[in-house]
């Protein structure tokens, strides 16, 4: 029973689809709806398969930089299978919340911030264990590091001088190191200073009465007097008193100049009501993450202003009321919920009584169960025997997984063994809405084929950026020098076989010294049409003897300077070969 009891703060699996992997979430709240059902407010975590390839490359680059900084080579000691399974354990934290039915919970798991001091094998050895190091924002598609930095160095810390010996004097000039703002040995008594501060508060209250914006924010006299009693008014009055040599008359004259009384306002008064509401909303969403609050809610405010306002806001009655309200809500909310073991998965292939099981719940599409020894093997571990089989992938592919690999697929979002089809599989595209297009793309991805454009605007893939490949002089020279190694015609027939550039570069380096003096042969260029016409006029070709017809059958013919080629189809006996069409026979005859 304890295994099926879920509490606030637990990391759990959620099932939103019978064929897709589980969602990994953290329970923040458990709320009971009006219908009596229990809903869980959860924090979202994302897998590698849920984000784009561009962000995956950034995440791998970040992991590589961390590995280089720590000077560890743990990744090099891992096998291909371990590296493949380690990617399934990586998650990306987000600040996104959602509400899901509590009945969709399928089990507990553990998620922790990546600990650089531990070996990555510790995450593979533990079941249902995941780690994260980056924060993913699904709205703007960005990745950020979820940890602070230790600011060490002279830029952030003071240089500690060496300890002075007994009787040794400090040669530093203290006036340059410190600024004196108050003298405790002043000629004024404490009572006189307190009376001066009362006058300063009265001046601040009168200044707020004259200021239009302050009178709107503090409509009553009590609120104006409370605002005038804040620290900024007292600090300004004490600083004024010190700068005027503790002369009360001159200090009061500075507080009340000719233009009107001096008004000192802090961040609590500078912020408007709408800005205060935005701050409370951001604080509810992000907590005390002031950088995110400034970036998403208050970009026109400085970080210093936001932090100063936060600590002043904690001294107000509104903060105390919200704290009591949250405590009362927490007492009334559910602390835990019991979710019984759910019904079997619909993708389970039933072989009882010879009845076929539905594949992926498709209507009218059935999968004929075969003998495990004669049927398809598991798509992950290639096992032929299992106590239970599950349909996996598109219905028409009739792929299946054994019970062990199916549980691994649901929990970790991938197949156990690294396969070529999974390496070449494209990430899921949430923009594709046509189910036929989705099944076609998944079918091609499972077989390791690149997805091609079908011509439909719905399935059209974004075109890549156009580029121009400019061949250098040395590349052209290498094509002639390294013909035997390059074999351009054979390489053109096998476009997916890579060319050994190292061998070509080595041969080019060996033969470049011998052929450096010989010039590069230029290709023969075709002469312009005007030159050819002039040559034919000067050297006309001999006309063959042709039997002339009778005058009655003669038809007027027009002379042409160049005969147009006849493109009509020839008979089988009169068909020309490839060399004749390309003019190779005339060269051989000459």
Swiss-Prot record:
One of its GO terms (molecular function) is transcription corepressor activity. Acts as a component of the histone deacetylase NuRD complex which participates in the remodeling of chromatin. Plays a role in maintenance of the normal epithelial architecture through the repression of SNAI1 transcription in a histone deacetylase-dependent manner, and thus the regulation of E-cadherin levels. Contributes to transcriptional repression by BCL6. Residues 266-318 form the SANT domain. Keywords: Cytoplasm, DNA-binding, Metal-binding, Nucleus, Phosphoprotein, Zinc, Zinc-finger. This is Metastasis-associated protein MTA3. It is found in: Nucleus; Cytoplasm. SUPFAM superfamilies: Homeodomain-like. InterPro entries: BAH_dom, BAH_sf, ELM2_dom, Homeodomain-like_sf, MIER/MTA, MTA1_R1, SANT/Myb, SANT_dom. It holds the Pfam family ELM2. Component of the nucleosome remodeling and deacetylase (NuRD) repressor complex, composed of core proteins MTA1, MTA2, MTA3, RBBP4, RBBP7, HDAC1, HDAC2, MBD2, MBD3, and peripherally associated proteins CDK2AP1, CDK2AP2, GATAD2A, GATAD2B, CHD3, CHD4 and CHD5. The exact stoichiometry of the NuRD complex is unknown, and some subunits such as MBD2 and MBD3, GATAD2A and GATAD2B, and CHD3, CHD4 and CHD5 define mutually exclusive NuRD complexes. Interacts with BCL6. Interacts with NACC2. Interacts with PWWP2B. GO terms for biological process: negative regulation of transcription by RNA polymerase II. Belongs to the metastasis-associated protein family. CDD domains: BAH_MTA, SANT_MTA3_like, ZnF_GATA. The modification Phosphoserine is found at residues 429, 518. The keyword Amino-acid biosynthesis does not apply. A zinc finger (GATA-type) spans 378-402. The gene is MTA3.
């Amino acid at each position: 029973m304890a295994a099926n009891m879920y509490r606030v703060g637990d990391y759990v699996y959620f099932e939103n689809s019978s064929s897709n992997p589980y969602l990994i979430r953290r329970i923040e709240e458990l709320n009971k709806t009006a219908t009596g059902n229990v809903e869980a407010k959860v924090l979202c975590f994302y897998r590698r398969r849920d984000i784009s390839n561009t962000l995956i490359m950034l995440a791998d680059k970040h992991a590589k930089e961390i590995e280089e900084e720590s000077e560890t080579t743990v990744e090099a000691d891992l096998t291909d299978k371990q590296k493949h399974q380690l990617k399934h354990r990586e998650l990306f934290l987000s600040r996104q919340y959602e509400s899901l039915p509590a009945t969709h919970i399928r089990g507990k798991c553990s998620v922790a911030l990546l600990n650089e001091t531990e070996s990555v094998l510790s995450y593979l050895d533990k079941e249902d264990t995941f780690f994260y190091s980056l924060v993913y924002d699904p709205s703007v598609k960005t990745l950020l590091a979820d940890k602070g930095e230790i600011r060490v160095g002279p830029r952030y810390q003071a240089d500690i001088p060496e300890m002075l010996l007994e009787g040794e004097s400090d040669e530093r000039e203290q006036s340059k190191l410190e600024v004196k703002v108050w003298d405790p040995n002043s000629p004024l008594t404490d009572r006189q200073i307190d009376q001066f501060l009362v006058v300063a508060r009265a001046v601040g209250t009168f200044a707020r009465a004259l200021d239009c914006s302050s009178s709107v924010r503090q409509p009553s006299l009590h609120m104006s007097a409370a605002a005038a009693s804040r620290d900024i008014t007292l600090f300004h009055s004490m600083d004024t008193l010190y700068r005027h040599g503790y002369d009360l008359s001159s200090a009061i004259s500075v507080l009340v100049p000719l233009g009107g009384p001096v008004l000192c306002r802090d961040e609590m008064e500078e912020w408007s009501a709408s800005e205060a509401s935005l701050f409370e909303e951001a604080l509810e969403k992000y907590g005390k993450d002031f950088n995110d609050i400034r970036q998403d809610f208050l970009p026109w405010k400085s970080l210093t202003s936001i932090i100063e306002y936060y600590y002043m806001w904690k001294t107000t009655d509104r903060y105390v009321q919200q704290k009591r309200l949250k405590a009362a809500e927490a007492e009334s909310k559910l602390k835990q919920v019991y979710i019984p073991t759910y019904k079997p998965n619909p993708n389970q292939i039933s072989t009882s009584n010879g009845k076929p099981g539905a594949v992926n719940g498709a209507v009218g599409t059935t999968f004929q169960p075969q003998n495990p020894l004669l049927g398809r093997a598991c798509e992950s571990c290639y096992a032929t025997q299992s106590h239970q089989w599950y349909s996996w992938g598109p219905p028409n592919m009739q792929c299946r997984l054994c019970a062990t690999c199916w549980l691994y697929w649901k929990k970790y979002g991938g197949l156990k063994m690294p396969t070529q089809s999974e390496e070449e599989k494209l990430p899921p595209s949430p923009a594709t809405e046509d189910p036929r297009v989705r099944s076609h793309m998944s079918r091609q991805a499972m077989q390791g084929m690149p997805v091609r454009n079908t011509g439909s605007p719905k399935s059209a893939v974004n075109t890549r950026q156009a580029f121009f490949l400019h061949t250098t002089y040395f590349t052209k020279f290498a094509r002639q020098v390294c013909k035997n190694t390059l074999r351009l015609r054979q390489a053109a027939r096998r476009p997916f076989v890579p060319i050994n550039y190292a061998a070509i570069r080595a041969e080019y380096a060996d033969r470049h010294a011998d052929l450096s003096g010989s010039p590069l042969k230029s290709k023969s260029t075709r002469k312009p049409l005007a030159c050819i016409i002039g040559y034919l006029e000067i050297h006309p070709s001999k006309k063959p003897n042709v039997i002339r017809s009778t005058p009655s059958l003669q038809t007027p013919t027009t002379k042409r300077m160049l005969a147009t080629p006849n493109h009509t189809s020839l008979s089988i006996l009169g068909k020309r070969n490839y060399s004749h069409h390309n003019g190779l026979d005339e060269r051989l005859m000459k």
